[in-house]
Each structure stands twice: as C-alpha cells, then as structure tokens.
Amino acid sequence: MSGLNIYFILQICSHTDTYFFIYSLSITLFFFSKYKMGVCISHEYSKPNAEQAEILQDFSKFMKPEERPPMAVEHQMYDYRLVEEEQDDELFAIVCCPHSIGYERDKIALVDLDPTSETFCTILSEVHLTSNGDEPGRMNWAKSAESLGEMNKFVRRNIIVPCMNSGKIYVIAFENEKLWIEKEIRNDELIRKDVSCPYAVRSLPLKGAPVHVSTLGDRFGNGKGDFILIDRRTWEVRKKSEPTFSDYGGDFSLQPRHNLMISSEWGHPRLLRDGFMPSELENVSESFGARLHVWQISPPKLIQSINLDTCDGSLVICVKFLHNADCNHAFAISAIGSSIFHLHMNTLTKEWAADRVAHVPLLKVENWQSDEMPALLTDMIISMDDRWLYVCGFLHGVLWRFDIQDPFRVSLHGKINLGGIFDSFPEVRIKTSNAMEDRWWLPPETRSLPRGTKFRGGPALMQLSKDGCRLYVCNSFYKAWDAQFYPELISDGGQMIRVDIVDDEMQLNEKFLIDMKGQPNGPFVIRDIKFLDGDCTSDSFL
C-alpha cells in the first residue's frame, strides 16, 4: 500500500464525523484501486463520475504529493496521416509459390499490383529454388526499417526464405525486377547446430544486427523451439549464445526498443507434416504446445514462459507486437481453440500475462469430417496505426476485423466471406442449432467472386498495405493442411485476391485476382506476400 493510501487511512481514523468518514473511505478506495495496477490503468478503470470528481475536489487539500508509480506506456496509435504523403502505394510484391504436388521446384515470384499497368495481376519475374519439395515457410526481408518514416528511404535487396521440409534457407537477391539466389544455406549446417525445420524470419533495424530465424525441431525432427542467427554480410549461420530452448518452436515477434522477443509453440514437426490426425486433436497437450515465451534479445535470455489453456491456446500460430515501439503490447492467435490473446506486461512486477480477448466458437455441422468445425485461425495482421486486427479462419472461410484501440476490450467490427469449407463442399451444412448462438461468428451468407472465379480453399495468409486500405489474401498455408481440407488447391493451384477497406467496411475487389491455375510446370499455390516498399508485417520498429 502506498504512502498516499496510509495517509487517507490516518485521516479516517482522526475524524469521528460519520459523513466525513464515508467520504474519506471513498477516496481511499478510489486511490487504492487506481494505483495498485501497473499496466495500462486507464483501460482497466473508468474515469470518476461526477460524484467522485466532486469528492476529489473537496478533499484535494488532504492529498499528499507523491510520484506516480511506473506504468506501462498507454496504448497509442500512429497517426498515419502525418507521413502518408511520404509513402507510396504498393506496386509490386514478392510472393512464395510452392509446387502443390512437389514434382517440380518451388519458386519465388515478383507480381504486378499496379491497376494502371498492362501487366496487372501477372508474374513479372521468378526464380526457382534448387530442389523439389522445399516447402517455404514465412519469408522476410533481411533488413528492417527503424520507423514508418524510414520505410521508403532504404533499399530492400535480400529476402530470406526458410524451408520447412528440406531444412534449407535461401537468400534471394532482388534488383531491377530480377530475382536470383545469392546464397543457399544447406540443411546440414542447421543439423550441426542441432536444429531443423526453419520457419519464420525477423530482422532488427540495427546496423550489423543478424537476421533471426526460428526453428521447429532438433536434428532428429523432434520438437525443439530454438533460433539461429544469420550474418547479413556473409550469410554465415551461427547459433544463439544462450543454450535455453523451448519444447516447441513456432512464430515470433521482435520489439527492439524494449529488447524483447515473444515466441510461440507449434508442435512436433513430423506431426505437422502429416496434417491433423483425430488422435492428436483428442489429446492436444501431448502433440502441440500451449505456451508463449518472452525472451531478451541481447544478450539472449529466457525471461518468462506463459502457460495457456490447452483447449484455447494450443498451437499458437502467430504472434505480433504492436507497431508503436513505445508500447509493449502484443497479440497472438491459436489454430486449435481459435482464440485471440492480448499480451501485456505489469511494469511493477515485470510479469507478462496473456488474456483471451476473443474466441471463435466451433460450428456444429453435418456431412463433414467431424460433427464440429473449428475456424482454424492461420494468420493475423495489425494495421500500421495499431487500430485494427485482421484474423482469417481457414476452414470457416471468414476474415474478421477487430477494433483493438483498447487492447483490453477488443471488439468485433466486421467480417467478410472468402471461400471456406461451405463453398468448397456444398453438401456440408451448418446445423440449425447454431442459430441459437452468437450469429456474429457465423459465416456471412453473401459471397462475391473475384473476376467471376471461385475462390478455392479459405483465407490462409495475408498482407496489408501501409495505409490500411488494401488487404491481400492467399489461400495456402501448408501443403499437408491444404491437401487435407481442400484437395482442389492441390489439383488446381492457389490464388491471391484483394479486399478493399472502403468507408470502414471490407469489400472484395472483383477486378483483382492472381490465379496459379494453368501456370507452366504447375500447379503452384501462393502463400506469404511482401511489398517492396514495406508493409504491415516486415519491420520491427525501434
């Protein structure tokens, strides 16, 4: 209890007037509640009402000056309008295109996003990887911008492509609309460091800082959450100096200003490659991870592990810090459990917590693989102004938009249907019992077709423009999952579509479609999108 609270208690004890006692007690409780927490207090307690304000004014003379205890920085959003004129709309994107069957090499392609161009929605150039079946994960640029204003002021020349199946890591060079392989890091280099299955890439905006790559397994393919570091000048691989690792690896996010990193847990790589088995889903605690890990970036050190409920938090597929480097808030989503978590730190105790702020319920269905269908959340994106959170449900075929201006009180703002099981398999129907539940979570009945073409599969991975007006969506996440739920993705290839945010609502752009069906040596699927001049996922601001 602070000195201020003790002071008011002494005031209470020194007065016998009942009326004064009641008012003094009210003040004591009010200030004790306001100062007992260390995280974003304004989001946990409402402003005083008129009566409380009057009490504060009447008894302000009794208030003893005291320093405010250390608080977490309030959630503040970027005002994108301040730098909007300095930013360019995305004209090109680099996309990852694995071969859907695997008898041809995967490729990385440059696509045209400029609606005024004659080559709009076509592949301008491409580079094939060196072997079949590499299965690229989440690629990223080797260089990060320090801030939003710096995005257009430096050249992005190299993109790092980790491959989950082959264990290779490719360094792809880009210049003058040409792509080529600058460096191939072979699997045996990772095996010697007792890691395998590289998945996600993040870069620091510091000069000379290495590229971080998360790995999902050990040398034998068992679950092991670790990281390797890649020198940006020589492309040499080294292991992090701290020997601690988690049970499982997964996605991760960097916050360099606070020297923090948060990583998630997936599961055993060998299980992920086989898709979802009923036996694994019945006992998720033995097959998948349900923890988030908070690390110190440099020198590397595990700070805290956060245990999530296994029903809600198993297989946390994605985790991201807010863009505003002053804030130490983050969000995460789980594939199994289809939940959204808000991560925040109490700056008095330095303890991190993960609150479940939203949950997409199971749908009761008939004529499907199971009687209940999860949403299977596969990706999320936070807008550059830290106001909106986009989450896609791979099976339900829905993209949700959440308002996160108050990260403690996340609210669902809108949704749009993009394919899904119900589009791919008309015989699958939602049982009428779902009508009694919250209809906000049911897939929308209205559907649109990009260029009159069916959107195969469901929304899997996304990218958002810096101004938050154009959301690009592709329909492949991992080929084992694609084949299990949407066989037509394997036979016909993947697609990339665009959702426009107009008047605060999401609308499918019916003129935009990149379809890999009919590609030479195909079919290919599309996943992971990176804009040349920066986007909402590539950079870790300082």
Swiss-Prot record:
InterPro entries assigned to the protein according to its UniProt record, in alphabetical order: Se-bd
Keywords in alphabetical order: Selenium
Pfam families: SBP56
Keyword Plastid: no
MF-aspect GO terms: selenium binding
SUPFAM superfamilies per UniProt: 3-carboxy-cis,cis-mucoante lactonizing enzyme (SSF75011)
Cystine pairs: none
Family affiliation: Belongs to the selenium-binding protein family.
Protein name as annotated: Putative selenium-binding protein
Lineage, opening ranks: Eukaryota, Metazoa, Ecdysozoa, Nematoda, Chromadorea
